Amino acid sequence: KNDLIGLIIPQAYITLVGMTGNRDDVVIASDRGQNAGANGNFNTIGVGDGFHAKDLTIGNYCNVDLVYERDTTKNHTKRQEAVTQAQAVTKVPGITDMDEWFFENCNIISRLNLFSRDDRPKRSLIKDCHLECTDDSLGTGYITIFENCTFSLFSNTPCGGASFYMQAFLGCEFTTQLSDNKTITLCKNTKPFAFIDCDFKGDMTGMEWKQSNFSDDIRQIVSNNTLNGQPLTISPDYPDLSVTPDEEQMKAFKYNGEYNIYNLLNGVGY
């Protein structure tokens, strides 16, 4: 709903660019969440079809301090310690056809939830970004590609519902700071993932594709992933769920040393 969005940008193909090139300098911020200044899951920004953000920060600081190094008088203390649903990015209500979100060299910051869960946009590319979150945060729409991003994970179910058709992490680095449960469980239901050239660091001890009831009719793509410098096997008790592409198959994801973003986002019907 509109009253749960701080900044609404309904127009198609709008680009927001931070003028300094330093993503820490330009901050779009809110500090409201569920039962914390809002009656519902509050969102910092709502955007439309073809939205592009570059060289800036989008954050919901309901449960995390805003530290603004360029001018410390603009620092802002979190609204509350208790973590509640406080999202950073959502779609604008009422737009039925939505595609092509692109975040480049951005910080996307919150705790519980980051992107709102929806069947739109059809495709999102998140490149060279830093993301911080707890649960139910990463991925939205049909296809989400994270390329060369860094993540700070503060809880162990970061993807929640995840994207419907594919959620790919390519050349990404994850740092974990978890509570008692040191196993990352990516998703609450069966969704397709790809992890290629990813590095996990911190206190996590292992990773599972989902919480329970593993499906036999889906395969996850994995290649060259590490945990604290050692090879990482996801869901080791269910090895048949993970497939490592051979040289020819890998061209769908990585070609001539570069990630094949064009192929991954060039979906039929889009």
Regions found by a protein language model. Name each.
Residues 1-270:
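Sequence-level preference for short, compositionally simple segments enriched
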